[in-house]
Amino acid sequence: MKILYFDCSNGISGDMLLKAAADLSGHSDEIYEKINEAAEHGICGGSHHGHGDCCGGHGSHGADGHDHHDHGHHGHSRSYDEVKSIIAGSRFPEAAKAAAAAVYANIARAEAKVHGATLETVHFHEVGRDEAIINALATGMAVSYIETDEIRTSAIYDGKGTVVCSHGEISVPVPAVMALRENCSYDFRTADVNTEMVTPSGLAGLMGIGAEPVEPGQDLLAEAKTIKETEAKGGRDTGRPGLKAYILEK
């Protein structure tokens, strides 16, 4: 049995998830080519939707790193319906579209709860940008190439304290992450780190690709043979290593 395993003891962001999945897929060149194509010509192959530039290239195209996502309300926003339309009309494979749609369904529910909105009225700011949508699509594409029987995640560690956004300081875990936590069965823990380690798009990404928690007390790395491993860092310096990801054979 082939297992894709994410060790989230150092947190997770959307960029970290993309980097790790692309590296393990063995098709990183193709995936980043697709990212650059979408950034240059528009996600749907037409005009660029334009909410900030995509850098492309191996590593990160700047979709989220460990930024503050939708903690603030500023600049252009997109409705959930708009994002769904963009995903459906994109030139990514169907498996990538399905994963990205699941990611944004999770984010929409969380943001609606945080802001007292409905799925029809909720709007996205940072996570509604082209870069973030491309990130979700590319992650789905990468995971589809890995063709695993199971996707598993370790306990997920977030930091503590506060982070600063346009409205001032907010508590960590941030509100959207707290809302997402209510809709999954992952094991959440707190690290002795005074900043954000888990971003909404990182957690929603795990949920969107169908990752399940390991069984209590289970040590997959000891039980299974490691076929391939990688580590991916995000944009925020937490003083810890990055997201570790493995392809395991059991």
What are these regions (language model features)?
Residues 28, 148-250:
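Mobile "lid/hinge" segments at catalytic clefts and subdomain interfaces of large enzymes
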Residues 6-20, 124-147:
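Conserved phosphate/anionic-ligand binding catalytic regions in large, soluble enzymes, centered on
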Residues 37-82:
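Histidine-centered metal-binding segments
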Residues 33, 52, 62, 143, ...:
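Short beta-strand elements
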Residues 89-98, 123-130, 162-168, 189-197:
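Flexible, glycine/proline-enriched loop segments at strand-loop-helix junctions
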Residues 1-40:
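N-terminal phosphate-binding or glycine-rich loops at protein starts, especially the Walker A/P-loop
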Residues 9-10, 38-39, 128-130, 155-163, ...:
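Acidic, glycine-rich active-site loops and adjacent beta-strand->loop/helix elements
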Residues 78-123:
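Anion-binding (especially nucleotide phosphate/pyrophosphate-binding) glycine-rich loop
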